[in-house]
Design a protein with these regions (language model features):
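Helix-loop boundary and gating motifs at the non-cytosolic
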Residues: 1-50, 198-239, 318
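Juxtamembrane intracellular "pre-TM" segments in multi-pass secondary transporters
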Residues: 1-2, 174-208
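Transmembrane alpha-helices of Major Facilitator/SLC transporters
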Residues: 47-54, 137, 235-257
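Structural signature of the two symmetry-related core transmembrane helices
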Residues: 69-84, 259-274
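Cytoplasmic helix-loop-helix junction between adjacent transmembrane helices
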Residues: 99-134
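Symmetry-related core transmembrane helices of the 12-TM Major Facilitator Superfamily/SLC fold
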Residues: 155-172, 343-361
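C-terminal transmembrane helical hairpin of 12-TM major facilitator-type secondary transporters
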Residues: 260-297
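A late C-terminal transmembrane helix in Major Facilitator Superfamily
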Residues: 308-339
């Protein structure tokens, strides 16, 4: 294993060690904010990430940053955001913290993927393996975070900050690229139009990811904490089930379930089971949500990796993801406020129906173009 591949693995493990993430909504919830205030906090992350994604290539060109330096700057923003999260009962400061964390995410989105594509021969293998390491990192950090949360609610945030510092050290020591490769990689791809097949996978990635992560991070913790009133052990069991299945599907099931609409089918099954609103039903439903989430990214990258347009497509997909995620959190938050979790599930079902109609259009268009 060469130094760069080791660096990619370590970077994706350490940078995705979000010890605090499963408890972020609960952390805000115990500060007595309303559901709308909570969803605005969550959406401010996406708004900041979305707005920066529109201009980040221009900003990076002006600053003349190498990809490894972009990742370092991203981690610095994350550390500052995490420090601000420690200020409890200061709503505006928490909003600023979420904005900085959103900027951090937007800066790093797609950069490590581009490094892999330009510098590593067996890129699909490294992508898939490192994706599974990301889920494993989320799983282990979530379990450790639950233990830390039981001791002190701020410790998971502090531990995430420590891992961000370690991530910067890893980047500096291992992610060394040829300067010319960075510049060449960014000038390609913007000329080509997206093919119908590429549009399908871009929409598949951005829309499903927005629904899955929006529901998992933005609503499930409130539902199982406030409505179902699960204890801490049950709470962790539900969240761990999702992460374990995300890891298994990303690492092992991708090669066997590499078909269109598998993620969509799993998401629909999740919604059906989740409506029963019991600990057992919710836990079982997390199996299907985890599979859907775990397949989403590696499957999309595998399908798009042969294109020289990969970086542009991933940036575009991330921008769409932010738009969908913001809209879903705000509209879903309103529905949850005026009704129950059933309102939200019906809303998601309607969104999936509209999404499938659009996907059907892209599929038919692709078939028509292939005939011609």
């Amino acid at each position: 294993m060469n130094k760069l591949i080791l660096g990619i693995y370590l970077y994706r493990i350490f940078s995705r060690a979000y010890f605090y993430l499963p408890f972020l909504l609960i952390y805000f919830l115990i500060q007595d904010y309303s559901i709308i205030q909570l969803e605005i906090l969550m959406a401010s992350y996406g708004i900041a990430a979305f707005l920066f994604s529109l201009y980040k290539e221009k900003c990076f060109k002006i600053c003349n940053l190498k990809d490894s330096n972009k990742l370092v700057v991203s981690e610095i923003f994350k550390i500052i955001g995490l420090l601000l999260l420690l200020y409890q009962n200061q709503y505006l400061i928490l909003v600023v913290a979420q904005i900085l964390l959103g900027l951090s995410y937007s800066m790093m989105a797609g950069v490590d993927t581009a490094i892999i594509k330009r510098n590593i021969t067996n890129e699909k293998y490294v992508q898939n393996k490192s994706n599974s390491y990301m889920f494993l990192s989320l799983l282990i950090s979530g379990i450790i975070g639950s233990y830390l949360y039981g001791i002190n609610i701020k410790w998971p945030i502090i531990m995430t900050g420590i891992f961000s510092i370690l991530t910067i050290i890893i980047i500096r020591c291992t992610l060394v690229e040829n300067r010319e490769l960075n510049l060449i990689g960014e000038t390609k791809g913007k000329i080509k139009k997206f093919l119908p097949e590429e549009k399908f996978w871009i929409l598949h990635y951005s829309f499903l990811r927005a629904l899955i992560l929006g529901f998992f991070i933005g609503f499930i913790p409130i539902n199982i904490y406030n409505d179902l009133k699960l204890n801490n052990l049950q709470f962790i069991s539900v969240l761990t089930c999702y992460t374990v299945m995300g890891f298994v599907s990303s690492r092992y099931l991708t090669k066997y379930l590499n078909y269109k609409f598998v993620s969509e089918i799993c998401l629909v099954i999740f919604l059906i089971i989740y409506t029963y609103q019991s600990f057992i039903a919710v836990t079982i439903s997390m199996i299907f949500l985890g599979i859907s989430s775990g397949l989403n990214r590696p499957q999309t990258i595998n399908k798009l990796s042969s294109s020289s347009n990969l970086r542009v497509m991933l940036n575009y997909a991330e921008t769409l993801y932010f738009i969908f995620n913001i809209a879903f959190l705000l509209m879903g938050g309103y529905l949850y406020t005026i009704g129950t979790i059933q309102y939200l599930i019906l809303f998601i079902s309607l969104l999936i129906f509209i999404y499938l109609i659009i996907i059907f259009y892209f599929t038919r268009r692709e078939q028509h173009e292939n005939k011609n």
